[in-house]
Curated annotation (Swiss-Prot):
Tissue: Expressed in NK cells and a subset of T-cells.
Protein's name according to its UniProt entry: Killer cell lectin-like receptor subfamily B member 1B allele B
SMART domains: CLECT
Subunit composition and interactions: Homodimer; disulfide-linked. Interacts with tyrosine kinase LCK. Binds PTPN6/SHP-1 in a phosphorylation-dependent manner.
Motif interval(s): LCK-binding motif: 32-35
Job description of the protein: Receptor for CLEC2D/OCIL. Ligand-binding contributes to inhibition of cytotoxic natural killer (NK) cells. May mediate MHC class I-independent 'missing-self' recognition of allografts, tumor cells and virus-infected cells.
MF GO annotations: carbohydrate binding; identical protein binding; signaling receptor activity
Protein's organism: Mus musculus
Pfam families reported in the protein's UniProt record: Lectin_C
CC terms in the record's Gene Ontology section: external side of plasma membrane; plasma membrane
Cytoplasmic compartment segments: 1-43
Gene Ontology biological process: negative regulation of natural killer cell mediated cytotoxicity
Length: 223
């Protein structure tokens, strides 16, 4: 065997003995993909989350709407009450030509009539004949009346059944608050005369004083 043949044989042997480097095995196209049910679960989860968010938003809108409706109703009720209470009677102002003192309004007549007719006139005004509350109120009226020489009927009369004076609202007369002068008999009525309260015949003609509560629900104009 010549040298050329030996070299060729050595090369072939070297090629045979050279280690082979195996290429990494190729992966299947589906190896990196998630299973189908995983993808479905993810889709359903996202859809459920979105639905939950929408439900929460809807509930929030509903609650806000209900609260707004309630607030509007309360405001409407308050406004209605305010409108009602700020009406003519709730302004706490007496009608024109009426005197105002504490929580009452007083009307002093300019004409004369019997006690019974005067009582009817006060009723028509939504008032009553004067019911004197105390000495301070009586003093206010005495100071307000310019015609000191006139007598003015008040809502006090003598009843034979009780043998006593009684106010027209049924309240018993208190002699500690008011002193009545003059003859007391059946058919007697009380009137303010000068600086005192006197007993006079109910059929006599006198002027009179009506009163009503300051917040009494009556029209603003005088009748």
């Amino acid at each position: 065997m010549d040298s050329t043949t030996l070299v060729y044989a050595d090369l072939n042997l070297a090629r045979i003995q050279e280690p082979k480097h195996d290429s990494p095995p190729s992966l299947s196209p589906d190896t990196c993909r998630c299973p189908r049910w995983h993808r479905l679960a993810l889709k359903f989860g996202c859809a459920g989350l979105i639905l939950l968010v929408l439900v929460v938003i809807g509930l929030c809108v509903l609650v806000l709407s209900v609260q707004k409706s309630s607030v509007q109703k309360i405001c409407a009720d308050v406004q209605e009450n305010r409108t009602h209470t700020t009406g003519c009677s709730a302004k706490l102002e007496c009608p024109q030509d009426w005197l105002s003192h504490r929580d009452k309004c007083f009307h002093v007549s300019q004409v004369s009539n019997t006690w019974k007719e005067c009582r009817i006139d006060c009723d028509k005004k939504g008032a009553t004949l004067l019911l004197i509350q105390d000495q301070e109120e009586l003093r206010f009226l005495l100071d307000s009346i310019k015609e000191k020489y006139n007598s003015f009927w008040i809502g006090l009369s003598y009843t034979l059944t009780d043998m006593n004076w009684k106010w027209i609202n049924g309240t018993a007369f208190n002699s500690d608050v008011l002193k009545i002068t003059g003859v007391t008999e059946n058919g007697s009525c009380a009137a303010i005369s000068g600086e005192k309260v006197t007993s006079e015949g109910c059929s006599s003609d006198n002027r009179w004083i009506c009163q009503k509560e300051l917040n009494h629900e009556t029209p603003c104009n005088d009748s």
